[in-house]
Amino acid sequence: MVSRLLSLVSLCLLGAKHIEAGVTQFPSHSVIEKGQTVTLRCDPISGHDNLYWYRRVMGKEIKFLLHFVKESKQDESGMPNNRFLAERTGGTYSTLKVQPAELEDSGVYFCASSQ
């Protein structure tokens, strides 16, 4: 049963500052079964047009997934496959959806923002 579980972990480590409200990402972690859908959300720092998604698989380096400017995708060269869908609504928050999730999707997912 444990081997059927898929852990998708979402942490906010990039782009946050103590001076102002930082990037907010949730859920902070998610454990799901293979085949289920997981949706991660990133709220950038207010006024930031650029939003980035990254993923780190255990034992490997952080990999770029995609970059938005406002609601427009600028570069999605790092998106793994067609089961991954990212959107940015009105240039504000972004969602990253994995459907259906597979074991190889396990990892730490990061988002960051910049002006």
UniProtKB/Swiss-Prot annotation:
Residues 22-115 form the Ig-like domain. The keyword Signal applies. Keywords: Adaptive immunity, Cell membrane, Disulfide bond, Immunity, Immunoglobulin domain, Membrane, Receptor, Signal, T cell receptor. One of its GO terms (biological process) is adaptive immune response. It comes from the Eukaryota. Alpha-beta TR is a heterodimer composed of an alpha and beta chain; disulfide-linked. The alpha-beta TR is associated with the transmembrane signaling CD3 coreceptor proteins to form the TR-CD3 (TcR or TCR). The assembly of alpha-beta TR heterodimers with CD3 occurs in the endoplasmic reticulum where a single alpha-beta TR heterodimer associates with one CD3D-CD3E heterodimer, one CD3G-CD3E heterodimer and one CD247 homodimer forming a stable octameric structure. CD3D-CD3E and CD3G-CD3E heterodimers preferentially associate with TR alpha and TR beta chains, respectively. This is T cell receptor beta variable 14. The gene is TRBV14.
